[in-house]
Amino acid sequence: MPADRPLTNSVIARWEGGWRCRVTAAGFDLVVDEPESAGGTGAGPMPTEYLLAAMSSCYALALCWSAGKRGVHLPDLTVTATGTYDGPRFSGLVLEVATSAPAEVVSPLIKPALRACYVSNTIASSPPIEVVIAGAPP
């Protein structure tokens, strides 16, 4: 691939009625739905929960990558992403890192991992969103 051509990645969401979609990503199917209290069937996480899942998992992997590059062993790791709703968006996002590794070992990994995390970088840079009408779905 030419160096001047950016890499791209796509996922497909197919509406299944109500508040439910089936998303295909890398050959995997994900169900997206709203809770019953919001008119959905509760058959899957909400889109915003998938956003938080993407952020927490991407940061966890970036943190492990950052540790590996520095020869640091993390015996265990949990990353919790929490978003604060403010109308139709999150007004704030918090990543909470839990590990039995000492804080003085983990602290130097935090910023490099944040720089390496595609999801947090994308959210922080707020890229423009273009909507294109493609015609009838396949």
For the regions a protein language model found, what residue spans apply to each?
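Extended beta-strand/beta-hairpin segments
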Residues: M1-A53, L61-P138
